[in-house]
Amino acid sequence: MNGKIFTLALLPLFAAGANPIQNSSFELGLTGVGTINYHKKAGAENWKSYKAEIDSSTAAHGKNSLKLIMPEPGMECEFSLPEVDTPKAGKYTLSMYVKADRPGKIRLQLNHVAADGVRWDVKFKYVPVTTEWTRVFATWNFKGIGPVSVPNLILDDNPMTLWIDGVQLDEGDTAKPYAPAAGVEAAVSLKGDLDWIYAGKHTLRVHAANYTDTAKTLEVKLNESEADTAFRRNLPPLKVELAPHSAKTVPLDYDFNHYGVSVFSGTVSDGKLNPAAFGVLAKLPDIKLDPEKDFMVGENEPPYMRRHRKERFAAATIFQDTPEKRWELLRASGMRMCRYWLRWMRFEPEEGKIANFPHDDDIAIMKRVGIEPVVMLGDSSISTKKGNENENWFIIKRSRQGKRTYLNTGSVRNFTRMDDWKKHIRDVVSRYKGMVRYFEIMNEPNLYFEPAEYVPYLKAAYETAKEANPDCVIIGICATGDFSGNLGGFIDECGKLGAFKYCDAVSFHPYSAQLDSDAVPAQQQIQQVKAILKKYGAEKLPLWNSELYYIHSLKENTKIMQDRSPVRYLLDGAVSAENALRRYLIDQSNGLAHTLTLSAGQFQNHFYQPRLNVSGSWKYHRAIPAPHMIAGNAFFRFTAGKKCLGPWVPLAGCNGAIYENSDGSQIAAVWAVDEDTHFLFAAQAGVKAFDIFGNEIAAKGTLTAKPVWFVGNDLKKNLTVAPDEIFAVRGIRAIGGDKTVIAIDVLNRSLETQTVQVKPRGVAGKQSAVIPAEASHTFLFPVTEFKKEYTVILSNGKKMQRVTRPVIPVRKSVKSGAVQTTPYGSFRVTALAEGLEFKISVKDDKRGDYEAKTPWNGDGVELFIDSRPFSGLDKGIYNDHVFRVFANPATKSHKASLSTSANLDSSAIRWEIKEKGADYEAVMLIPWKSLKMNAPATLAFDIAVNDSDENKRISSIPWSGDGDNYRNRFNFGTLTLK
């Protein structure tokens, strides 16, 4: 058959836009095309890089086809295109023209995202392929309405050279005659089909194709934009002459002088221009960092690995990248360490049989490219569950299984035999002696073990590793604040058991304090952990942040927590450039040794498939860097080799870090803690300002949550930061009861004491107060009814402000000493001179048991107390003035108990639980001092009674709030004294 038989000239006229797939016949080269080659059971040392190619010697349509090569079995080659809109439920047909150098089969595939943006289906069909051009197709029915689909083709264990052309997606069960997405298409690419470059002059290629029967004089209008820095510039219009059924590539010498992820978009006359994106980074200085002396940024797992199928690992060529190129990109983003999860079950799949893949190859390539490996040991040995792939592994089968873990996954704790554990440590440390110095002992053991259960494993690992390699560094504890993990409590208990004697460094995962806007700011949590180390004489141990996949502001996390859909985990994993940079700066300026926060999958930019909400490690398409990688590039450029002088807080509500060069000049990064609060900065002559990616900006401007870099001398003197407004209304809260009142929380943001007059519109009267610098005051205004929002007028006599804020809804209110009847019985809360007294009577039918770490899952009473309910009204999240108490009656496993949140001393509380059958009465008296109060005052509280039968909580009945009480203090009701 003639290789050109399916030319456009022989096809009927098409309806423009009928085929949603861009560059579907590859006349625009490799623009938009993504390929991945998985090399099964073949590691990085034996890497075979098979790249996608455009072949102009054979085509089914036009002049070009896509050529994929898979020369041997044991591999997989995947080809994918940008996502397309498929908004309707129903049938869709994917078709394409294919031929191969030998008969075989290929897998057509369509990834479809459902309407909720989370659920996705993978539909596939194997079809035969011959040595002649043949049109193949597959039809699938999608029941759920969804926004997008991604066409894929996979060569799976079928060695061949394959040519592809004329890809089309049709609605319905029939493949319509092939037609491109538009009569004219245009796109851009970089010479060499690169996805990222170092700043400077490069060849930008403009591709244009005319699929019509008419000659065209096209005008291509391009613009370059970068979202994080609001950068945009227009390129001069370009004229392109095209004959019928022809394509052309025009090279342009272009200066890429703006750091960031540059998006090229625009228009082409009579057609469609497909957007493209490229990462532009600065070439970093060749500064060699010493992990024993210098702060280093790292990440989790190699950037070219993905688990493939149940029993295999596979190294992947991402589009045109080799492993070295992938690591070059990570090094360009400032990464110098990799936390490598050495999976025991892969390392020793059978007793005494040590596998060399992928561990040997991965570690070898890291050392070759200048990445310090940090090997994490013990992941497979911590837990197991029925049906898990490690259930029949020899280590698990001869280990002792304990109670369930503290995760809601159905897993149980696994206690590996100590002899097996020591042998594994010896095997790994000995094998990589001279290559790997750093070893972390178990991932987040506080979710699986009690301190007394973990410390023996740590001790054994430390002693065994030191015997195998005295020069190795053992990183211990690795506690997490995620999944309600009691990070501080676990570290403290480990300290009591002498754990720090078996650590050369201590790691933690600060999920409970991701940034400085949290209720417990990130820097405060670091100091808390350091205080625990000092308590046990271990203050000289280096402290590492070895994982933090989720880095969000308080506002972002609040929004994410409100999302009940499965999309929540995807929102968690989407990390912005400013948040990653802020965490690096916080960690270094507050004395951490290293920070290895994100995972390799988070370094992908999903530009071509933004709505395909699947895990990043399953969504490699092109090697475009994520924006936070450009921010990491700037971080290294500004800080590597510099002396960190510590944190710098120019003004309340700001945060920063400051550094010193060897010549005495300084570098600083400063930002606003909350994204809704802005400041103004002004740098004196000689001080330069740079944006988050290191582009120079004006020396005067607005300071937001995106850090601004400053370079110059004596920055604390030559840089001014001021609030954009003197006062902030942090929030307005409605208070019910006999008298309805609104509380208005006003903050003086300036560095001077201010006299402020406050007047809410539509409310009688106005009030004044003197507010010290950077302090707040709460104004209480009686109202006849509550509005949804109020406009507040503020004045210091010189300047007037108008601020509109929504009202935090009213909750229940009760007077001190009044008895409240409830579905479970009754309660009374009384503000006594010596403290706050609770008396709760509960009717119960059956006593339920619970785990000691989760008292809320058993029969019992839960108290929520906010001793300052009308201040800090910008944050509903818990703060240091919110307390929790759990009172549980006796069960078959536990005596009657009382436990509290970490900020409340349980020993100061007088309490008693009286039982009568299954019914019980709990009485508690909490001293005012314990609640950080000097005397009785109005406060907020809630009471939830938990009902459990056997080992499962049946219900939880709150008085005022709901199931969000554990994280939202605005749910609590009010206790009034009058």
PLM region spans:
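Aromatic/acidic polysaccharide-binding cleft in carbohydrate-active enzymes
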Residues: 550-637, 649-654, 663
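Aromatic-lined substrate-binding rim segments of carbohydrate-active enzymes
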Residues: 327-332, 337-406, 420, 424-429, ...
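Intrinsically disordered, low-complexity Pro/Gly/Ser/Thr-rich segments with frequent PxxP/GP/PP motifs
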Residues: 230-258, 761-787
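Carbohydrate-binding surface patches
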Residues: 203-210, 214-216, 648-685, 692, ...
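Structural preference for beta-rich elements and adjacent junctions enriched in aromatics
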Residues: 782-978
